[in-house]
Amino acid sequence: MGKTVINCKPYFKAATPQGHPQSWIVPDLCKAYNWPANLAGGGVIAIVELDGGWVQSDMDSYFQSIGQPNPQITDVSVDGTANNPNQHLGDPRDPDYEVAMDIQVAAAAYFVATGQPATIRVYWAQDIASAVQAATADGCDVCSISWGADEALWGVDAAQQMEAAAAAATAAGMVVFAASGDNDSSDGGPTPANVDLPSSCPHMIGCGGTNKTATTETVWNDEPGETSGEGTGGGFSTIFPVQPFQAGAPNGPGRMVPDVAADADPMTGYTLFTHGAEVTGEGGTSAVAPLYAGLFAAFGTKLGFVSPTLWSNQLCFNDITQGDNGAYRAEPGPDPCSGLGSPIGTKLANLLATSDAQASAAGV
């Protein structure tokens, strides 16, 4: 069966100037999430991109500004698609911002956990499944996907192709994270409840969004300074059935999304570097997938289909109990707004890192 190319969109958002965003630098956000340190690392991070590009000078400026060494970044053209920056200047959906966010967040999060520069391979392709297959063939350890579209736009055949690629990736030991979308529970669709794909694939870890301050964390939904209808994606798949590993999930007609969450609200967003300038208030669930990818790459082992382990260890996450994404409200325990919650980095490291990495983190 040939590949189906879906018109996917990048899931980054920017706060409007009147929004006065509070902006995190990644090392400080990692500290707020109790990131581990001195892990063994060694994991290779795959990042999937469908458009846009990056330039070295932006990376130099960003990593110098946060006191980290540059990561090792390799571009991989899967089907002729290539790193092609500065083609959408002035477009509010300029995908260069997506590419910068993915690389900068993943690499910075990895360095905080390991003290080592990250190794990143950026896979350029017209369709996500082909990029995931290429990353699997290359032996990458984790994969971050910040592009997607409403399940209805994919249809069953393309969704099954995507899930097959994800299942093969996890069978080879790769963990795959995917943004759950930025248009609340509707996912920009015609009804109040639609989920985003590929995050709804059972072998992906769907990544939802929160509003994270120094003292509070709630579900990300639109606020003053944001466009109406913005907020974390989440809900229940109409293509993939209920998953046995999602113990404790609310009753629904299909696989629940997201599995996990972290800061995504542009009003509590990220400080990054793109087009020769520092930018603040960058957000979207696009930031959450690379944040987790950076952490999991630090664990020093091929975890593969790790979702059942995460769902069996819910105390490794900060439960988000306030807020909604339109059709669904946060509640104690897993919910279709924030999944299991936001990461407690040290607990996840104790659960998942290799014994050598755990010993290093403990100073043994």
What name fits each language-model region?
Residues 333, 352-364:
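Low-complexity, Gly/Ser/Thr/Pro-rich intrinsically disordered linker/tail segments
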Residues 198, 220, 245, 272, ...:
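Short clusters of hydrophobic/aromatic residues that line enzyme substrate/ligand-binding pockets
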Residues 1-209, 233-284, 300-308, 344-354:
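Substrate-binding/charge-relay-adjacent region of secreted/lumenal peptidase catalytic domains
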Residues 206-208, 214-219, 302-313, 317-318, ...:
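Acidic/polar loop patches that form or flank catalytic/metal-binding clefts of enzymes
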Residues 217, 293, 348-350:
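N-terminal low-complexity, intrinsically disordered patches enriched in charged
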Residues 283-297:
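C-terminal substrate/ligand-recognition segments
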Residues 293-336, 340, 344, 356:
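An often Trp-containing, charged/polar helix-loop segment at the C-terminal end
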